[in-house]
């Protein structure tokens, strides 16, 4: 959108809004700017993890249904439990998870159940569950110890079941306790009080309570030994005791009327049995579990390598543990280093000669380093200021590089290094701009059309000269005067060169006709100038006269007698008509026509010859030509050139002194003329429908026209096919312009699907009001750009649903972009007025627009 848009008065209709839902086989190619803030990155990762978990649950379990898994051992029918998992992610946020575990008692099939071959498996699973609980308890003990610094603390964990409400917990707590709760419940159901084979494990179902609450307690005791010597530190020995507490459901509640009411709770604590558990799990296993948990936490934090500022519980715990360990290790290291240094250098520091020698050495090294630094700085300053001058485009790009570096430095943790990094990034950007090779320019519409015009024109003239050479022959060619036009040999090919501005004239002796060649520069100028003036003629006449009539009128134009003389070696001189070639005489000598156009253009052109080595193209003449095309002009033909008068088509052009043009036109002039042709062609293609609307249906008989968003009157600017060679060149040029402009008309090329516009906003810390305003402005901008449907992805505030309803209502009512923006401004004024008075706005932006739009 290069042109200015009056948003408040825009009459474009609003587009529809939909939720983006990619297919199963559709790849998502997201392109977005990632933030350098670690808090946002961690938040995004956590949200992605929650979404992935929800998708996995949706695949395995259907919404609203439960998954019950019953496991029972054929050898031991007493054990059996089922896990019911209710998927409620589609109804609420991922934090609202319901996890329920039930216990089923399978009655005995015989009077006594034998363990048989399954006793060994039960024993292994029993101790594995106990060991897992121990590792988890040890990890929690160490984390709490590192945070609070308490040595004697009891880690208490309980799992509530049944009809008791689950306490409100965050998702991170639920994730961290999920494994422990599951293992605890399994060990409770699988192993009631003792290990298998202990004598009282195998009993009837009446001996074990039907509903139990499981609690695990970790106690730490310290025992201090007596000191053996005066310098010995008091050694401390920690003993770990692990026991399980069972609570009977029948003892806690009394059943009254089919409901459970809480009563005085009684806890049944079993005595510590060192022969049962603590004797089987040795002290080495507990120490190993403790070291494994510590190493695991350290390795996780080393892998992450981030600075955590989030309030997540797990990250805070790990950070504090690491900080405390690091402080202790660094403190011990510094103390030992200083003690060793003092013991070694204690005697040397008292020696004055040694101290003076050390000072001299340090001073000499420091002076040398300072000298090197100053030399480097001065050399850099000299190179920047005197040796290598920075080009103009690099100086313009320097501000952009500095602003980019400043933006990229936001979010850095250490503010002290900000200036250093900023200078390094700016210097790197500047060096890349200075020493990098210039990028190749993209193929623009002007370059494409200019190449096409010159190539077609050179091919046309080559064919014409081949016919002349065959009919006349070189033996009849005579050079009568210095102004006689030279003719090329039949074996010369005028293929279009790669660089238009660097066309050069090969040396040739004028006395040998077989070595004669046309100057490619002049032929390029002839063709471009002819196309330029023909297009200007169409602009002036509004397409009401044929291009051939203008060619014939220009061929009989009388020029003033006081024109400056032309150098004899110029290859675009006027040639006398060839006698004997009746066909060429009937069609007029186009070379003389081109020459006349050039001579006239030297006095009237749209470009000024500046004194700078690189002339710049002004934009004002283009605007004048645009106005000339937009308003309907008089249909009377322009006056022919008489004396010093200029034609009506060139009346608004800028004067240029003829003395500034020498005999041979430079490549820069060729480039300027080519740009003028292109700008006028673009003007015609965009805005020639104002004065040609009446001719749109009369002369539109060409069936080969392409259907596009352009009006039919555009083709009235095109001359009829086959009316002349110059008209054929213009026909091809207009067609190239038309094809080029199709890409910007809003319609995709044939065979290509329309692009899909998807908006994904990630404003985690922004308010709901700002998010709604951002979504509305994105919708309005897409409507102004004629986007059919705007898709939104990644919404958690309910904005999508409201915006869908608003867009559907606006489309039904036929609202425009200007009406929507005016409504938004009214809402903002009301909201600011309410805030100034102290009132609260009752409705949000989307709700207010639904009511008042």
UniProtKB/Swiss-Prot annotation:
Localization per record: Cytoplasmic vesicle, Secretory vesicle, Acrosome; Cell projection, Cilium, Flagellum
UniProt modification remark: Phosphorylated by STK33 during sperm flagella assembly. Phosphorylated on tyrosine residues.
MF terms in GO: protein kinase A binding
Keywords assigned: Cell projection, Cilium, Cytoplasmic vesicle, Flagellum, Phosphoprotein
Basic and acidic residues bias locations: 219-235
A Pfam family reported for this protein in Swiss-Prot or TrEMBL: AKAP_110
Chain residue ranges for the region called PKA-RII subunit binding domain: 124-137
Tissue: Testis specific; only expressed in spermatids.
Disordered: annotated segments: 188-240
Modified residues (Phosphoserine): 205, 208, 403, 635-636
CC per GO annotation: acrosomal vesicle; cytoplasm; nucleus; sperm fibrous sheath; sperm midpiece; sperm principal piece
Cited InterPro entries: AKAP_110, AKAP_110_C, SPHK1-interactor_AKAP_110
A GO biological-process term: cell surface receptor protein serine/threonine kinase signaling pathway
SMART domains, alphabetized: AKAP_110
Modified residues (Phosphotyrosine): 404
Impact noted for substituting residue 15 to Y: In SPGF82; uncertain significance; decreased expression in homozygous patient spermatozoa
Disease field: Spermatogenic failure 82: An autosomal recessive male infertility disorder characterized by asthenoteratozoospermia and multiple morphologic abnormalities of the sperm flagella.
Free-text domain note: RII-binding site, predicted to form an amphipathic helix, could participate in protein-protein interactions with a complementary surface on the R-subunit dimer.
Family the UniProt entry places it in: Belongs to the AKAP110 family.
Function of the protein: Structural component of sperm fibrous sheath. Required for the formation of the subcellular structure of the sperm flagellum, sperm motility and male fertility.
Binding partners and assembly: Interacts with ROPN1 and ROPN1L. Interacts with QRICH2.
Name this protein carries in UniProt: A-kinase anchor protein 3
């Amino acid at each position: 959108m290069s042109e200015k848009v009056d948003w408040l008065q825009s009459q474009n209709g609003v587009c529809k809004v939909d939720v983006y839902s990619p297919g199963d086989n559709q790849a998502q190619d997201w392109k977005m700017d990632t933030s350098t803030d670690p808090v946002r990155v961690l938040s995004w990762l956590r949200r992605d993890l929650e979404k992935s978990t929800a998708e996995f649950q949706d695949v395995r379990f259907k919404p609203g249904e439960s998954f019950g898994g019953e496991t029972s051992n054929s050898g031991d029918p007493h054990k059996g439990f089922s896990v019911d998992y209710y998927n409620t992610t589609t109804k609420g946020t991922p934090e609202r998870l319901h996890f329920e575990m039930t216990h089923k008692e399978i009655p005995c099939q015989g009077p006594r159940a034998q363990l048989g071959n399954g006793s060994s498996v039960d024993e292994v699973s029993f101790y594995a569950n106990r060991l897992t609980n121990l590792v988890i308890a040890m990890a929690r003990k160490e984390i709490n110890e590192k945070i609070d610094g308490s040595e004697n603390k009891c880690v208490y964990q309980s799992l509530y079941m049944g009809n008791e409400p689950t306490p409100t917990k965050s998702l991170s707590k639920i994730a961290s306790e999920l494994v422990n709760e599951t293992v605890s419940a399994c060990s409770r159901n699988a192993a009631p009080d003792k290990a298998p084979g202990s004598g009282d494990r195998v009993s009837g179902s009446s001996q074990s309570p039907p509903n139990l609450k499981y609690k695990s307690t970790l106690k730490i005791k310290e025992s201090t030994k007596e000191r053996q010597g005066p310098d010995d530190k008091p050694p401390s020995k920690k003993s770990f005791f692990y026991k399980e507490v069972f609570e009977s459901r029948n003892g806690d509640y009394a059943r009254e009327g089919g409901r459970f009411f809480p009563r005085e709770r009684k806890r049944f604590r079993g005595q510590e049995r060192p022969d049962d558990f603590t004797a089987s799990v040795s002290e080495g296993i507990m120490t190993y579990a403790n070291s494994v948990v510590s190493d695991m936490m350290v390795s996780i934090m080393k892998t992450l390598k981030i600075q955590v500022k989030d309030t997540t519980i797990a990250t805070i715990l790990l950070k504090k543990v690491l900080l405390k360990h690091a402080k202790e290790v660094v403190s011990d290291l510094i103390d030992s280093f200083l003690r060793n240094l003092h013991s070694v250098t204690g005697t040397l520091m008292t020696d004055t000669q040694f101290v003076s020698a050390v000072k001299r050495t340090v001073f000499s090294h420091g002076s040398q380093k300072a000298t090197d630094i100053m030399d480097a700085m001065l050399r850099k300053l000299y190179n920047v200021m005197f040796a290598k001058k920075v080009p103009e485009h690099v100086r313009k790009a320097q501000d952009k590089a500095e602003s980019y570096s400043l933006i990229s430095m936001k979010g850095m943790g250490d503010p002290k290094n900000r200036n250093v990094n900023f200078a390094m990034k700016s210097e790197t950007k500047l060096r890349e701009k200075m020493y990098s090779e210039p990028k190749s320019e993209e193929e623009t519409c002007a370059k494409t059309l200019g190449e096409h015009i010159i190539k077609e024109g050179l091919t046309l003239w080559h064919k014409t000269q081949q016919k002349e050479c065959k009919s006349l022959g070189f033996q009849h060619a005579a050079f009568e005067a210095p102004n006689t036009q030279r003719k090329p040999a039949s074996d010369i090919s005028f293929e279009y060169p790669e660089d238009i501005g660097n066309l050069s004239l090969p040396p040739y002796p004028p006395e040998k006709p077989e070595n004669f060649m046309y100057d490619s520069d002049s032929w390029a100028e002839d063709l471009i100038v002819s196309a330029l003036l023909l297009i200007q003629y169409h602009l002036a006449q509004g397409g009401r006269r044929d291009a051939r009539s203008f060619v014939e009128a220009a061929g009989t134009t009388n020029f003033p007698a006081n024109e400056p003389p032309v150098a004899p070696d110029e290859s675009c001189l006027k040639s006398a008509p060839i006698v004997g070639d009746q066909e060429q005489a009937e069609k007029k000598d186009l070379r003389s026509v081109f020459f006349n156009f050039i001579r006239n253009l030297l006095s009237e052109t749209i470009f000024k010859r500046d004194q700078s080595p690189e002339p710049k193209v002004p934009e004002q003449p283009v605007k004048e030509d645009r106005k000339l095309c937009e308003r309907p002009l008089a249909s009377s033909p322009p006056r022919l050139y008489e004396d010093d008068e200029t034609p009506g088509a060139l009346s608004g052009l800028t004067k240029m002194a003829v003395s500034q043009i020498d005999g041979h036109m430079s490549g820069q002039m060729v480039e300027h003329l080519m740009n003028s042709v292109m700008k006028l062609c673009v003007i015609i293609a965009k805005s020639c429908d104002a004065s040609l609307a009446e001719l749109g249906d009369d002369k539109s008989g060409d069936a080969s026209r392409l259907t596009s968003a352009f009006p039919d009157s555009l083709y009235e600017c095109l001359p009829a096919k086959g009316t002349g060679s110059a008209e054929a060149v213009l026909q091809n040029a207009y067609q190239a312009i038309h094809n080029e402009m199709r890409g910007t008309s809003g319609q995709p090329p044939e065979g290509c699907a329309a692009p899909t516009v998807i908006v994904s906003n990630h404003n985690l810390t922004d308010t709901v009001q700002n998010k709604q305003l951002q979504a509305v402005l994105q919708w309005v901008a897409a409507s102004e750009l004629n986007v059919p449907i705007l898709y939104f992805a990644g919404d958690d505030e309910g904005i999508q649903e409201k915006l869908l309803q608003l867009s559907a209502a606006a489309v039904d009512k036929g609202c425009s972009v200007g009406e929507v923006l005016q409504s938004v401004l009214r809402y903002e004024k009301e909201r600011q007025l309410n805030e100034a008075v102290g009132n609260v706005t009752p409705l949000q932006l989307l709700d207010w627009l639904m009511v008042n739009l």
